[in-house]
Each structure stands twice: as structure tokens, then as C-alpha cells.
Amino acid sequence: MNDPRKGADAEPTTHFGYQNVPESQKAKKVAEVFHSVAAKYDLMNDLMSGGIHRLWKRFTIELSGVRSGNRVLDIAGGTGDLTRQFSRLVGPTGEVVLADINASMLKVGRDKLLDKGVSGNVSFVQADAEKLPFPDNHFDCVTIAFGLRNVTHKDEAIRSMLRVLKPGGRLLVLEFSKPSSNLLSKAYDAYSFSLLPLMGKLVTNDSESYRYLAESIRMHPDQETLKAMMVEAGFDRVTYHNMTGGIVALHRGIKP
């Protein structure tokens, strides 16, 4: 006979790619992925996207509305592509915080930006998006690029981002999404599940991390679902822009 207490006490599960894992294990598994790929992260981004990721990020910067004197939080900032541009925009009177939960990615980002002479108005913080260690109503703009799909409790992370934004502040979520046509979706799946792991094997000697990447993209909420999550969290005027046929979407919301 089954013991009902065993089911009641069982740890909740979540997805890690296509696997179901205990929630407490997902963060550890995601950390292992990014520890593995950190050193070749920029190179793989260029190879995987053909450099198009730079255009996606440029549009994010343009839509952010960031200007001189602003305070910006770049969550899952990784190797610092957005942080570098925000540092230039906010100037000496502004501030940019690059936050990442992964120590290896944070080190790569810090070293890269310091090598490029980006300092003074940039700080680096190891932080969990679900429990941001910043005061309420603190930032003019919060961004998270290609990071939300790796978060265990996305709704908690979105609420945390809302909390640290000033009234009128903007959240921008740049993330892989659902292609707008079935033909493109099939072609993208074939690319993601066949070529990405092969490239990962050749460049980083790690095919499994890039298999997880492909699976995590497919498990991420689609455009309308993510929009609804942002509205539910309390954001106003939530919109999204599809790029490259919906392979990537940029969501934007305003804190009331």
C-alpha cells in the first residue's frame, strides 16, 4: 500500500531541458552547464547565431530608453555585451550592475570588460534572479538576455525584477521563443538538435551542454505566455517584438 505521506513530502520537480529533476538540483545542473561553456561562450554565440545575436542585443539597447545618469541592472549579464553598451550610455553619473548567478560567467565578464577599459560605473554581483539583493525602487532599467529560460521559478524572478525597478522603470527580456511559422520551426529544431550539439563538441568538447540549450529553448514559455506572466506579476504596457521570425523575442514592460 502506498504511503500518502511520502507523496506529500516529495520535493517538487521542474524541467532541466527535457528531464524532470528535483527543484533543488536544477540550479546546480544549470551552473555545471555554464561553468563548462564560460570560456568559449562568446565564440559559440557568434558561431551559433552567425553573429546575429549582436543585432538582437543592439535592438534591446535601443528599446531600453537608457540615458545619462540612469541606474541599470543587467541580470544574467554573462560576458557583458549589454553591460558594456549601458556603461557608455549612462556615463560617469550613472551606474550599471552586471549580475550573474554563475561565478565562472561573472569572472569571464569582469575580465573581458576590464580588458576593454570598462570600469568606474560598472559593478559585478553574483546574484540569483529570484532573490535579487537590491533595494526596492532602485533601478531605471532591468534587462535579462538569454537567461530567463534557465531560471527555476520564472514568476518569482519577474516579481523580483518588478520590485527593484523604480516606478516607470522598464524591464526588457530578450530570449529565444517560438518561431512564427511551422516551416521555420521545423528547420530551427533540426538545426538546434543536430548542429548545435555537434558545434559544442567541436569547439568546447561538450555536446551535452548544447543539447540542454536546445531543449531549454523548447521548454521556455512562448511569446503570449511570457507576456501574460509579466502582466500577472504587475507590469503595465507589456509588448513584445519578434526577431528573426520569432526565433527570438524581446518583451518590454513598465512598472506602474
From Swiss-Prot:
Xref: SUPFAM superfamilies: S-adenosyl-L-methionine-dependent methyltransferases (SSF53335)
Catalytic activity annotation: a 2-demethylmenaquinol + S-adenosyl-L-methionine = a menaquinol + S-adenosyl-L-homocysteine + H(+); a 2-methoxy-6-(all-trans-polyprenyl)benzene-1,4-diol + S-adenosyl-L-methionine = a 5-methoxy-2-methyl-3-(all-trans-polyprenyl)benzene-1,4-diol + S-adenosyl-L-homocysteine + H(+)
Any GO BP annotation: ubiquinone biosynthetic process
Keyword field: Menaquinone biosynthesis, Methyltransferase, S-adenosyl-L-methionine, Transferase, Ubiquinone biosynthesis
The protein's annotated pathway: Quinol/quinone metabolism; menaquinone biosynthesis; menaquinol from 1,4-dihydroxy-2-naphthoate: step 2/2; Cofactor biosynthesis; ubiquinone biosynthesis
Molecular function GO terms recorded: 2-methoxy-6-polyprenyl-1,4-benzoquinol methyltransferase activity; demethylmenaquinone methyltransferase activity
Gene3D superfamilies the UniProt entry points to: Vaccinia Virus protein VP39 (3.40.50.150)
Bilayer-spanning residue ranges: none
Keyword Transferase in record: yes
UniProt cross-references to Pfam families, sorted A to Z: Ubie_methyltran
Top EC class of this enzyme: transferase
CDD domains noted in UniProt: AdoMet_MTases
Residues engaged in binding S-adenosyl-L-methionine: 79, 100, 128-129
Domain of life: Bacteria
HAMAP family membership: MenG_UbiE_methyltr (MF_01813)
Similarity comment text for this entry: Belongs to the class I-like SAM-binding methyltransferase superfamily. MenG/UbiE family.
Xref: PANTHER family: 2-METHOXY-6-POLYPRENYL-1,4-BENZOQUINOL METHYLASE, MITOCHONDRIAL (PTHR43591:SF24), METHYLTRANSFERASE (PTHR43591)
Protein's name according to its UniProt entry: Ubiquinone/menaquinone biosynthesis C-methyltransferase UbiE
Organism from which the protein derives: Pseudomonas aeruginosa (strain ATCC 15692 / DSM 22644 / CIP 104116 / JCM 14847 / LMG 12228 / 1C / PRS 101 / PAO1)
Organism phylogeny: Bacteria, Pseudomonadati, Pseudomonadota, Gammaproteobacteria, Pseudomonadales
